[in-house]
Each structure stands twice: as C-alpha cells, then as structure tokens.
C-alpha cells in the first residue's frame, strides 16, 4: 500500500449483492453508513474506491462503488480490505481521553518502573474484548487485554502506554503464581 503513509483499516468487502455491482461491506466505523464520509477508500494493491451509494442492511452496509457495475466485478472484490489515510479521521470530535485504535500502534508498552515490554503492533477484537498485540526485539508477539486493569495510562504525545504486567498476564503474581491459585490463610 504505497499510496498511504499511515493507513487505517475501515472496512472489508464481502459478497456481491444483486446484479448492479453492489457489495456487502463490514464497516469498522462508528456509524457504518458514514463510510463514504472519510473520502476515497484504498486497497493494499493501490486501487482507489469511491462510494456512490450506501445503505444499511443486517450487520453490514450495502455499497455501490464507482466503476463496479456488475455482479462479476463485485464478486472479484470479496475479501478486499479498504483503508484511508489516518489524517482523514476527524480528531476534533474526540474528547481529551479518547483516541483511535490506529493511534495505539507503535506506542511503547512500559510498566510503572519504565521497563519495556515491546511496542503495540496491532489492536484486535475477537469477540470477548479488545486485545493489544505487543512485540519487542527478539520476543514473540503476545496479546494482552485492553482493559483499565491492564492498561493504566495512554500517553500519545510521549509515545507510550503504561501497563500492569501482572494484570496483563506478562508476569506471574508471586502470591498466586502457577500451582498456587489462592494465597492460603494459616490458623
């Protein structure tokens, strides 16, 4: 994706809908019907898509793109991911403590002592809550829960987020580590 400097995934194209070139699209925007409000959408292979029509359907939006005029052309788009440039996202609508998930990528994850656990390489939602992927030099990627207990502070200007490594599952709690599920009380 050479055209975009800081791409943000906005949608994934699904199956064709009807005969006029419409496609079912899974939009990752707050308002799925506003997908076209962010400007042209770009694919990883460099194609540009302009939204002509959009309407809501069950769990998706149905979109007609410029230049996609028949079912065959629409079917060829199945599975295609669509991106915009990060600068096209409206920052002025955000509160002070709000951010876009795309802004988290690249932040260094540190604990309160400053020890680094790598940087954020992705944000995922597999249905049970958001997860941050951390990757450090020479380390395998790990997923940590994106919760208020695991991520204590986010500082976009400093380029870091402060985590609790125990709550994030990166280190064992000395009191209740493996083989010791609960601290025992002695009489």
UniProtKB/Swiss-Prot annotation:
Residue ranges annotated for the PRC barrel domain, each copy included: 96-169
UniProt-annotated location(s): Cytoplasm
Cellular component GO terms held in the UniProt record: cytoplasm; ribosome
Main localization (coarse): cytoplasm
Source superkingdom: Bacteria
Keywords: Chaperone, Cytoplasm, Ribosome biogenesis, rRNA processing
A Pfam family per the record: PRC
InterPro entries: PRC-brl_dom, PRC_barrel-like_sf, RimM, RimM_N, RimM_N_sf, Transl_B-barrel_sf
Record bears the keyword Cytoplasm: yes
Biological-process GO terms, alphabetical: ribosomal small subunit biogenesis; rRNA processing
A molecular-function term among this protein's GO annotations: ribosome binding
Subunit structure as annotated in this protein's UniProt entry: Binds ribosomal protein uS19.
Family: Belongs to the RimM family.
HAMAP family: Ribosome_mat_RimM
Biological role: An accessory protein needed during the final step in the assembly of 30S ribosomal subunit, possibly for assembly of the head region. Essential for efficient processing of 16S rRNA. May be needed both before and after RbfA during the maturation of 16S rRNA. It has affinity for free ribosomal 30S subunits but not for 70S ribosomes.
Record text about domains: The PRC barrel domain binds ribosomal protein uS19.
Protein name per Swiss-Prot or TrEMBL: Ribosome maturation factor RimM
């Amino acid at each position: 994706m050479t055209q975009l400097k800081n791409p943000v995934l906005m949608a994934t194209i699904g199956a064709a809908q009807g005969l006029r070139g419409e496609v079912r699209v899974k939009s990752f925007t707050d308002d799925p019907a506003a997908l076209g409000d962010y400007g042209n959408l770009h694919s990883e292979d460099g194609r540009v898509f302009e939204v002509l029509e959009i309407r809501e359907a069950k769990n998706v939006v149905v979109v007609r793109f410029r230049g996609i005029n028949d079912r065959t052309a629409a079917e060829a788009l199945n599975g295609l991911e669509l991106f915009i440039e990060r600068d096209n996202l409206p920052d002025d609508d955000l509160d002070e403590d709000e951010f876009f998930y795309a802004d988290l990528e690249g932040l260094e994850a540190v604990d309160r002592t400053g020890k680094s656990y790598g940087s954020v390489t992705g944000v995922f939602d597999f249905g049970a809550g958001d997860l941050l992927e951390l990757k450090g030099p020479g380390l395998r990627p790990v997923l940590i829960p994106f919760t208020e207990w695991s991520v204590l502070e986010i500082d976009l200007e400093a380029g870091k987020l402060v985590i609790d490594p125990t709550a994030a599952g990166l280190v064992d709690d000395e009191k209740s580590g493996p083989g010791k599920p609960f601290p025992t009380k002695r009489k």
